[in-house]
Amino acid sequence: MSRIGKIPVTVPAGVDVTISGQDVTVKGPKGTLALTISEPIAIEKAEDGSLSVTRPDDERRSRALHGLSRTLVANIITGVTEGYTKKMEIHGVGYRVALKGKDLEFALGFSHPVPIEAPEGITFVVESPTRFSVSGIDKQKVGQISANIRRLRRPDPYKGKGVRYEGEQIRRKVGKTGK
């Protein structure tokens, strides 16, 4: 049995979970998220209000999807109650970020500013010209937008310039030694 999959998912007060076949819809104080569970996995609501994720057999695919499905359900419940935030920082002379309406505009050493539009359900907060955060209720969407922003100017291994996650350690390389 999957060690993660067999743990029941607790549903906090104020969160409404609707299960219809393989579809799970979660409504909470921050919004609504929906998820479709893969076919061999079943999800049931227990009497105490928690959710249990079960698999019909011990086939390799069922075992692989068991823990994944339980974690995805737990993530959407956390998303509609607390939400997710990724804090990011920019290092480099002249590199900065500004909020234009709901969107971000980066100056990253290119000849032009780089705009990033806020997709539905994502909010940007700029704390300073070199620090900002990406927030939302969908963990996958927050992580993907953060990764796309980081990809604009990856941290340089020689000088450390670029966009990085807060607290991320960049592996530095030693430059060429002159004669």
UniProtKB/Swiss-Prot annotation:
| Keywords, in A-Z order | Ribonucleoprotein, Ribosomal protein, RNA-binding, rRNA-binding
The Gene Ontology biological process annotation of the record reads: cytoplasmic translation
Pfam families in the cross-refs: Ribosomal_L6
**Annotated Gene3D superfamilies:** Ribosomal protein L6, alpha-beta domain
Q: Which GO terms describe its cellular component?
A: cytosolic large ribosomal subunit
**InterPro entries the record matches:** Ribosomal_uL6-like, Ribosomal_uL6-like_a/b-dom_sf, Ribosomal_uL6_a/b-dom, Ribosomal_uL6_bac-type, Ribosomal_uL6_CS
For this UniProt entry, the molecular function terms from Gene Ontology, in alphabetical order, are: rRNA binding; structural constituent of ribosome
Q: Spell out the SUPFAM superfamilies in the cross-references.
A: Ribosomal protein L6 (SSF56053)
HAMAP family for the chain: Ribosomal_uL6_B
| Oligomer and partners | Part of the 50S ribosomal subunit.
Describe the function of this protein: This protein binds to the 23S rRNA, and is important in its secondary structure. It is located near the subunit interface in the base of the L7/L12 stalk, and near the tRNA binding site of the peptidyltransferase center.
Q: Which family does it belong to?
A: Belongs to the universal ribosomal protein uL6 family.
Q: What is this protein called?
A: Large ribosomal subunit protein uL6
Please name the source species. Answer: Rhodococcus erythropolis (strain PR4 / NBRC 100887)
Gene that encodes it: rplF
